[in-house]
Swiss-Prot record:
The modification Glutamine amide is found at Q67. Antimicrobial peptide which inhibits the growth of Gram-negative (MIC=16-64 uM) and Gram-positive bacteria (MIC=32 uM), and pathogenic yeast Candida albicans (MIC=16 uM). Shows a broad-spectrum of anticancer activities against several cancer cell lines. Also shows slight cytotoxicity on human dermal microvascular endothelium cells (IC(50)=4.85 uM). Induces low hemolysis against horse erythrocytes. Residues 23-44, 68-70 form a propeptide. The gene is DMP-PH. Pfam families: FSAP_sig_propep (PF03032). Belongs to the frog skin active peptide (FSAP) family. It is found in: Secreted; Target cell membrane. Expressed by the skin glands. Its main location: secreted. The keyword Transmembrane does not apply. Keywords: Amidation, Amphibian defense peptide, Antibiotic, Antimicrobial, Fungicide, Immunity, Innate immunity, Membrane, Secreted, Signal, Target cell membrane, Target membrane. GO terms for cellular component: extracellular region; membrane; other organism cell membrane. One of its GO terms (biological process) is defense response to bacterium. This is Dermaseptin-PH.
Length: 70
């Protein structure tokens, strides 16, 4: 009977440890995904600003060429 109790305790303990490790990995993966999302949003905002400025510069150059030709 004593061996059975020890075996059950060992199985329970290993199950809890396994579950704990899985939860920790899941939490780490979620944190990584959140960081990736934040970085993606920052990159998107940066590209939006760069393209906006490039568009303004191109439009100004076209206006200068049109006005210079008249």
């Amino acid at each position: 009977m004593d061996i059975l109790k020890k075996s059950l305790f060992l199985i329970l303990f290993l199950g809890v440890v396994s579950l704990s490790i899985c939860e920790e990995e899941k939490r780490e993966n979620e944190e990584e995904m959140e960081q990736d999302d934040e970085q993606s949003e920052m990159k998107r905002a940066l590209w939006k600003e760069v393209l906006k400025n490039a568009g303004k510069a191109a439009l100004n150059e076209i206006n200068n060429l049109v006005q210079g030709g008249q």
